Amino acid sequence: MAMTMRLDVVSVEGSLFSGIVESVVAPAEMGAVGIYPGHAPLLTRLKPGAVRLRIPYQAEEEIVYVSGGMLEVQPYKVTLLADVAMREKALAEADLHAEKHRAEAVLKDRVTADAYARLEVELAKALTYVQGVQKLRRRGF
C-alpha cells in the first residue's frame, strides 16, 4: 500500500474535501508545490488555480479550483484554507458567466462596505470557476 496523508480543503463556505490522499500539487505563490507523505513542514500562500489530488485507488486525479488562500503542510497532514474553492465536476460555465456579470454590475453601483466585500468574494469565485472551465476545455473535456 502506498504511503498516504490526511488532507482537509476548507473554504469560507465550508469543508470541500476531508480524506486520505497520496499526493497534492498546489499553485503556491512562488510556483507549483508537490506534497507527498513525510513532507517537511511548510506554510505558503496560494495563487488562484488548480489543486490536484491523488486519491488512493482512484485512476484519475481529482481537481479543486481555488481563488487563493493558505496551505499548511505537516509531515502527514495538509490543510488548505481557500478563499473560494470548487470541485472540477461542479463547474457550469453558463451559470458562472452570468454570476460574474451580475457581480460586476452590482459593484459599479453604490453599495455598503459589507455588501461590497461580499460581492468581491462572489466575483473572485466566479472568475476562478470560469478559469477552471476554460482550462478543462483546453484539456479536451
Curated annotation (Swiss-Prot):
GO CC annotations, alphabetized: plasma membrane; proton-transporting ATP synthase complex
Main subcellular localisation: membrane
Keyword Phosphoprotein part of the UniProt annotation: no
Record has Protein biosynthesis as a keyword: no
Places the protein is found: Cell inner membrane
Quaternary structure (record): F-type ATPases have 2 components, CF(1) - the catalytic core - and CF(0) - the membrane proton channel. CF(1) has five subunits: alpha(3), beta(3), gamma(1), delta(1), epsilon(1). CF(0) has three main subunits: a, b and c.
Role, per record: Produces ATP from ADP in the presence of a proton gradient across the membrane.
Sequence similarity: Belongs to the ATPase epsilon chain family.
Name of the molecule in the record: ATP synthase epsilon chain 1
Origin organism lineage: Bacteria, Pseudomonadati, Pseudomonadota, Betaproteobacteria, Nitrosomonadales
Gene this chain is encoded by: atpC1
